[in-house]
């Protein structure tokens, strides 16, 4: 485990869906990216800015879906905008809730925007650990 600094995110949905299969089947998709690890891509003292890594799906989605490209550009006015997975949502990291909320509110008609707090720990992992402890405690009694 490693510490993840607190961060706020603006998440914007541009009102369309992006078929994941089509993105992964795209002939223009880069398929020879070097492997990366989360720990290896976080520089010492990282504070959520700039975001580490890259998303090889982003150029494909940007080229095929103008709405996503527009959302990336618009959110990019406020911070470093990135594609979530294969889309269609885009996001940017911010140091505080106010900046994230301001960016999330700057959406075009038909889009949705949210300001959300980043999580330092997966809720699913925490639940699995609680259940494991509970089962282990019950087995001893």
What is each stretch, according to the model?
Residues 1-80, 95-141:
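Conserved, helical-rich catalytic subdomain that frames metal- and/or nucleotide-binding sites
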Residues 89-95:
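Short beta-strand->loop micro-motif that forms the acidic, two-metal-ion catalytic signature
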